Regions:
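Basic/polar N-terminal segments that are highly enriched at the extreme N-terminus
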Residues: 1, 18-20
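Conserved S/T- and glycine-rich ATP-binding loop of Class I adenylate-forming
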Residues: 1, 10, 276
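Catalytic-domain carbohydrate-binding cleft regions of carbohydrate-active enzymes
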Residues: 21-276
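Sec-dependent N-terminal signal peptides
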Residues: 4-16
Length: 277
């Protein structure tokens, strides 16, 4: 009887442990009319892929002026997209007008990037809100916590795992940190984890770019309860869900938006800090 009881307890522990180690992934697109956004087909492609894969979630980092051209050249796809972007499948995570790297321009210029970009996006998609700042390229600078909070953002992400050739943040912390600006303003942030190493034999990636088991195991060993990877695909690529779909999703990952991850999945708060001078 004691042996049977021990086996049952072991099975319960294993099931609980496996459940707590669910992997998550934030997919999306980045680009724009001046970089890479094939206007003739891209918007309809996004709409069709979201319809085909109802469990897919994406974050959009598209130069706001792009939508002026999309509205003119592919009006039907534009109309369909307007309905989808206010659904739980989509989150806009970088509304800056031209996706600046931020660390090489002044604070006033950064503010204008957000101001003009948000106004343009709201003109096209009035129901869109801006909750999380997340980028594919390393568009970070120390004053962002204050600026983001002033524009109504609640969260930030310091990962850029598939575009490290432009730069990358220091590896620090666990599931969440408070990113603190020079003025003392904090913003709840998903960092580049301390266990998130640079990818071997690559000059542009960290291990978080595709939810490999080695990355997820490192996260679990580091005590990260809800490990998450990300990749915002180039808008010029004709590719849907980055990790696959249905029963073929890599590492049994679940697609989420960053807003959903912060508010419904992550540990929600932390006392750990990064960035305070």
């Amino acid at each position: 009887m004691n042996r049977l009881y021990s086996i049952i307890l072991l099975l319960v522990f294993i099931c609980t442990h496996v459940h707590s180690q669910q992997a998550y992934f934030v997919d999306g697109y980045h680009g724009g009319i001046y970089g890479h956004y094939p206007v003739k087909w891209k918007t309809q492609f996004i709409v069709d892929q979201l319809s085909k894969h109802p469990d897919w979630r994406i974050c959009l980092e598209i130069e706001p002026e792009t939508w002026d051209t999309v509205q003119i050249q592919t009006p039907e796809a534009y109309r369909q997209l307007k309905n989808i972007v206010v659904s739980k499948q989509v989150e806009f995570t970088n509304p800056t007008y031209a996706q600046p790297y931020c660390y090489n321009i002044s604070g006033e210029s950064i503010i204008r990037q957000f101001q003009y970009g948000i106004a343009k996006i709201n003109k096209h998609f009035p129901g869109v809100t801006f909750t999380t700042y997340s980028v594919e390229e390393p568009c970070f600078t120390s004053c962002l916590p204050q600026i983001l909070k002033l524009f109504g953002f609640k969260y930030a992400v310091l990962k850029c795992p598939n575009t490290c050739w432009g730069g990358y943040t220091n590896a620090y912390g666990g599931e969440l940190v408070n990113w603190v600006g020079p003025d003392g303003t904090p913003i709840l942030t998903v960092p580049r984890y301390a266990c998130e190493k640079l990818e071997e034999n690559s000059t542009w990636q960290t291990t978080a770019w595709c939810n490999e088991e080695s990355y997820l195991n490192a996260c679990r060993d580091a005590g990260i309860e809800h490990p998450v990877g990300m990749c915002f695909q180039d808008a010029g690529w004709k590719n849907g869900p980055w990790l696959g779909s249905g029963k073929n999703i890599k590492s049994n990952s679940i697609y989420v938006t960053w807003k959903d991850y912060f508010e419904n999945i992550s540990i929600g708060k932390t006392n750990d800090e990064i960035g305070r001078a």
